[in-house]
Amino acid sequence: MKIAAIIPSRYGSTRFAGKPLAPIAGIPMIQRVYDQVKQAICVTDIAVATDDRRIVEAVTRFGGNALMTSAACRSGTDRAAEAAKQMGLAPEDIVVNIQGDQPLIAPQTIDETLAPLLSDPDLGMTTAAFAIMDKQEITNPKDVKMVFDADGFALYFSRSPIPFARDKDTRFDTFKHLGIYAYTRRFLDIFTQLPNGVLEEIEKLEQLRALEHSHRIKTVVTRYDSPEVDIPEDIPRIEAMMASMAAD
């Protein structure tokens, strides 16, 4: 069985054009992500999926594998599905979809997210969550929050703070959704054929499509955060975190 990590990467961004090639401590962000993914123990294949030749050339320069996909892909998941088809993955193979703007994605998180699919072949999709430590992230709509049931299956994802504590002295963890998914190739093909959901369109969160169509998403809680780069101003923060990690 193959376990393919696919990193969807788009050059055009309204908030940060050319983001995948932006240097982080002198190295393109897409290379930072790729290098983190290479350290995951369970991953057998890696590919960057893009619709831009500049990204293909950058990945090729550092010795990585890049696939050209259609500019018509609606989302990173659609791009990952197209790449999985190009790679000839079998229905039982596993695809890990890792957003290309997470230069600090922990290899351990990748392996942890995969684990439920390896132990339970009936699962179709998994993801990861992190208990928020920076309270500003709870109210920031770019940080997606999630709740899950007692068995670890996702109940909802939202840009709003969830759950809401009616009693202000209630103590609980708020979980941030991390930008990583793992699916069987079979389920990935099913997912991309589903019509968009109402909640998905309201929140602009494609993972809600699975829940709205009664598919379950197993959630793994990791102790490793994975901050994203959304705008140029995020890069100094990431570089500072890298420097702090190197000093420890």
From Swiss-Prot:
GO terms for molecular function: 3-deoxy-manno-octulosonate cytidylyltransferase activity. One of its GO terms (cellular component) is cytosol. The keyword Oxidoreductase does not apply. GO terms for biological process: CMP-keto-3-deoxy-D-manno-octulosonic acid biosynthetic process; lipopolysaccharide biosynthetic process. It catalyses: 3-deoxy-alpha-D-manno-oct-2-ulosonate + CTP = CMP-3-deoxy-beta-D-manno-octulosonate + diphosphate. Activates KDO (a required 8-carbon sugar) for incorporation into bacterial lipopolysaccharide in Gram-negative bacteria. Gene3D superfamilies: Spore Coat Polysaccharide Biosynthesis Protein SpsA, Chain A. The gene is kdsB. This is 3-deoxy-manno-octulosonate cytidylyltransferase. Its main location: cytoplasm. Belongs to the KdsB family. It is found in: Cytoplasm. Keywords: Cytoplasm, Lipopolysaccharide biosynthesis, Nucleotidyltransferase, Transferase. Pathway: Nucleotide-sugar biosynthesis; CMP-3-deoxy-D-manno-octulosonate biosynthesis; CMP-3-deoxy-D-manno-octulosonate from 3-deoxy-D-manno-octulosonate and CTP: step 1/1; Bacterial outer membrane biogenesis; lipopolysaccharide biosynthesis. Its EC number is 2.7.7.38. It holds the Pfam family CTP_transf_3.
